Amino acid sequence: MENRVAIFIDGSNLYHALRDNCSRVDLNFTDFTSKLCAGRPLFRTYYYNVLQDPNQRPEGFREQQEFLDVLKKTPYLEVRLGGMKLSQGVPVEKGIDIMLATDLLHFAWNNLYDVAILVSGDGDFAYALQAAKNMGKHVEVAYFESNISKSMLDVADNRHLLNQEFFKGLWRAGLKRRPRRGRKGPRRPDRPADSPAGAPAANSVSPAET
């Protein structure tokens, strides 16, 4: 097996897990994905998030654009952005999880990778990972201990525990830690709040959750 790796990043989940566990979010994505690949060839990295509304949150939109500009300069990384809709007057993500799961399965079906690494603790992705396994693919999960579903751990062939030690040397040079903010904003139905980088918040998932 050639072990071509495709990395799928739940941007909301990663942003808030970094903020809560490492108190900073200025991640060097090239070094991060290289460490996950561990010498295996990278097919491509896909980053998923919601596009901020410049009319509702102009500051958040500006900060997100700066963040996305950095991402788009990362080799072999594609940004996938979903939209927002109002739910009981509150903006929520629209279609991000479906977009990620569809890409993961579509690329598996077309044999574009041998190993899928999903950077998320969201148990909603467990079924997609199992389907990829059924196609003969290896699936790995990169997660924070405070934000992982048991179903994800059960389905994964291999697991990457993310913590402060893992991220040593993976931060972007010359940037200071961004202070935590508590502003309200667009969310997923189960993920209240938002981030300065434009990533809606992810609720912590108990390791006992299925």
Kindly give the residue locations of the regions a language model identified.
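Domain-level signal for Mg2+-assisted phosphodiester chemistry and nucleotide/NA-binding surfaces
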Residues: M1-V92, M99, H138, N147
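Nuclease catalytic cores that cleave nucleic-acid phosphodiester bonds
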Residues: D69-D190, D194-P196
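Long, low-complexity, intrinsically disordered segments
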Residues: P192-T210
